[in-house]
Amino acid sequence: MSQPPAAHVPVLYTQVLEGLQVTENGTYLDGTFGRGGHARGVLEHLGPGGRLLVMDKDPEAVAVSQHTFGGDARVSIHPGSFARLVQVVAAATVDGILLDLGVSSPQLDVAGRGFSFGKDGPLDMRMDPDSGQSAAGWLAQATDREIADVLWTYGEERQSRRIARAIVARRGEQPLLRTAQLADLIASVMPRGDSKTHPATRSFQAIRIHINRELADLEAGLDAALGALKPGGRLAVISFHSLEDRIVKQFMARYAKAPPSNRRLPEAQPFVPTLQLVSGAIKADDSELAVNPRARSAVLRVAEKLGMENRESGMGKGHGAAASRFPTPDSRFPTSPNGDAP
């Protein structure tokens, strides 16, 4: 199988294309174009009758897609989040959908985007800089409880309360406007440890997820993708942290597997699967990690939408689809004796 251009190394490139099973005349949607590494691979397998729809909420990624593929009649470009893919495609018309979640390498590498604690820049973190509130704006007005809830819920940061109190105290003295300011402040209040991970890692992740509504978009996008796929169509999702992967795993399982029965409840209607799991968690091997260390946390999951004839053959007893909600920062979390999250 061909390899992507050296200038951009998309994670799990070969595994994604194998999972999507791209056909010459199929219709595919890349909901997170980024810099187009996976999209190029899909196009290599499409013939003149194939179609590729690309989406991205980042205006810079949209500009790259227009420059790279604007002259290709097989490609249509749609600015915006994949959560709104129902505005781009009709139901049951797509052969494959790819969602490559999280922040992209270009977003991390450009200090001016404000995503990285390793590069000083404006404290922004918005994937679409023209929409919504920046990280600096939110931190300037959120209460310490709201900040702590976000850090714990989206970053699983054990020192969430301590960090939140420090942010509120510091902003009373001077505004937090730069990524280095925030990273240094977090590092200054964290207990000393042996971890090789930067002390601001979890907090930056949590704030970014909150600012961009990433988990809300993910759940909406998964629901929309299921409706957009044809029977036999494939959904491939790459996640980069446990919160994302948990949502993806639970979503696929909810439509593929009958829930456990409960003898205390009345007999339910037979469970009819909508998805078939193509693979479990797929991770990068050592050869990929050697050239692309950022792939170390990537997890790919693939599922196939079933047609009615296949759904009936997979019927089992169950109690219907249980609600699967992503965590919200409004939820209360327990505290340890020192007042921080456990």
Swiss-Prot record:
Gene Ontology CC terms, in alphabetical order: cytoplasm
What's one GO BP annotation on this UniProt entry? rRNA base methylation
The protein's UniProt keywords, in alphabetical order, are: Cytoplasm, Methyltransferase, rRNA processing, S-adenosyl-L-methionine, Transferase
Sorted alphabetically, which InterPro entries does this protein's record hold? RsmH, SAM-dep_MeTrfase_MraW_recog, SAM-dependent_MTases_sf
| Cell compartments where the protein resides | Cytoplasm
EC number(s) per UniProt? 2.1.1.199
Q: Which reaction does it catalyse?
A: cytidine(1402) in 16S rRNA + S-adenosyl-L-methionine = N(4)-methylcytidine(1402) in 16S rRNA + S-adenosyl-L-homocysteine + H(+)
**Gene Ontology terms for molecular function:** rRNA (cytosine-N4-)-methyltransferase activity
Q: Where is this region: Disordered?
A: 309-342
Q: Which enzyme class? A: transferase
- Residues given in the record as S-adenosyl-L-methionine binding sites: G36, G37, H38, D56, F82, D100, Q107
Compositional bias per record (Polar residues), positions renumbered to this chain = 333-342
To which protein family does this belong? Belongs to the methyltransferase superfamily. RsmH family.
HAMAP family the UniProt entry points to: 16SrRNA_methyltr_H
> So what does this one do?
Specifically methylates the N4 position of cytidine in position 1402 (C1402) of 16S rRNA.
The entry's protein name is Ribosomal RNA small subunit methyltransferase H
Source species of the chain = Xanthomonas campestris pv. campestris (strain 8004)
